[in-house]
Amino acid sequence: MTKKQKKMRLRIIISLVLFVILFVCEHMGVLEPLPWWAQLLIFAVPYLIVGYDIIFKAARNISHGQIFDENFLMMIATFGAFGVGEYLEAVAVMLFYQVGELFQGYAVGKSRQSITEMMDICPEYANIEEDGKLVTVDPDDVEVGTIIVVKPGERIPLDGVVIEGESLIDTAALTGESVPRRASEGDEIISGCVNGSGTLKIRTTKEFDDSTVAKILELVENASSKKAKVENFITRFAKYYTPVVTIGAVLLAVIPPLILGGGFAEWIQRACIFLVISCPCALVISVPLGFFGGIGAASKIGVLVKGSNFLEAVAEMTTIVFDKTGTLTKGEFKATEMKPAGVSKDKLLEVAALGESYSNHPIAGSIIEAYGKEIERSRVSDAVEIAGHGVQILVDGVMTYVGNEKLMKKQSIAYEPCESAGTVVYVGQEQTFLGALVISDTVKQGAAEAIHKMKNVGVKKCVMLTGDREKTAKHVADELKLDEVHAELLPGDKVDEVEKLLSAQKDGERLAFVGDGINDAPVLTRADIGIAMGSLGSDAAIEAADVVLMDDDIRKIASTVLISRKTLRIVKQNIVFALAVKAVVLLLGAIGVANMWEAVFADVGVSVLAILNSMRVMKNADLKK
């Protein structure tokens, strides 16, 4: 509870104690002998203690031309109650309204907590070495390439690469992951995480304004400005609703006495009851609070949603499209299969590794990594790269060929075609075929589970787009049980495929695209919902996306769908409940059946119940599993 909330709580307690005393005194007849002005002054004390700020806000807003708001309604209703001699009811209305406001403030604080935890990732300083001493500087002043020192317990201020030291890194604030990650020399590291056990020296790779933490803070700060359709509806509704009910209350106070005759006091009281009931707090508070709670619940599991409009769109998602590399697969080439012909697997791998020893191609690197031994340069010579074919090289004095089918055909080597999914590397020496290696991009751990979860939450179609060969793409799609696959695509082709999928959708259906690369930015922008990888993803992809997975775990997309649907369900419940109760009590108040106490329930009671309902959105810890 904040200092301001504690002060309000004290005002409520003092006012409540005085209210109870006055309530007892009135019912015992103690106040009856006093003149009306003395009673008014006595009841004004607890009223002003608890409600002076409401009167001040209403007066200030009126002076600024903003007349019709909940402060104005409360002021007019309670002044009216004082005017007709209902002093106790006037104090009760203001007291319980402020109880509701305090409760609302507490609820908003709770729902903001996980988001403000994410906001707390901002580092306050960076340590750099000068003349053998550590000097504290502002992260904004650190240039790219500077070596910074991060001690145990300190927050990592800038993105960079570890050049010295080893430690466990707490990434919970960014990714929602409770298990620390190990970082050592050569590892990339992102700002905003907390260094655990060891001192690290890090060479910075980005300025602070371009760092991960700066971008996240910018995204979080902008999230609340992007409203969902239902929020915009409530904003427009409140704009017209409040003036209408105010005019209605005035007419209720004036017209019936003129037509039916009799005193104005009873009808003014009914008009005051009408005003209290009609206060739109339950709607104006609970709807944004529900969406804010949904965004907070998503951030708890490491998913950053950039606005309630995108949270609403996720709830309507029926098609999800994945880029393959880096999203469904690791983007790391591995030698997944060896098919020797007349030699051992070890011999095939050795010759292939030696043959690729002069190449800097990623596939060559994966073969050398699979070999796992130091390359003896003395055994190889005369390497020649043949564009579009492969390499020819002398290995132990024997002419060796490592490459694709074209190379085997060009050298007239009788090879055995390999139909395995992946990139096939053929190996031959002189005119002898030694065999083939299959190099594949491995499927990410949890990718199959992610697809299964998405289908369980009602996503109808899972599609994969890739620039890879048809056979490789089909193999991955079959392994993950995807509904559609489109292969051998250029970046522009991906946009075209998404356009086709969008045109096939019905009203109320939404399409999401999940990607991580710079070339994915146009597709992320074009899709109804763009989902980017926050850890491995490019800055352009994160900027273009509407939702960011802070730890690149696509299993959390299904959890976000559940959170968004629960949020929308609760928001709609609040709207229906608030309008229904208010409509009934408004009618009862207008005909004189409901009194000021029922009016207080219709306002404060409904608001509190709606707020409690909204807070249920935050209870989504089970979705992480």
Per-range role (PLM):
Residues 69-74, 115-130, 299-324:
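Membrane-cytosol interface motif
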Residues 58, 86, 107, 126, ...:
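Residue-level signature of catalytic and energy-coupling elements of molecular machines
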Residues 19, 23, 42-125, 129, ...:
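Actuator/coupling domain of P-type ATPases
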Residues 117, 131, 309-529, 562-565, ...:
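Cytosolic catalytic headpiece
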Residues 14-17, 232-261, 270-291, 572-601:
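Bilayer-spanning, highly hydrophobic alpha-helical transmembrane segments
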Residues 20, 24-35, 55-61, 79-80, ...:
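Membrane-embedded alpha-helical bundles of multi-pass transporters
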Residues 59-69, 103-117, 289-308, 615-625:
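Juxtamembrane helix-loop transition segments at the membrane interface in multi-pass membrane proteins
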Residues 1-14, 241:
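N-terminal membrane topogenic signal
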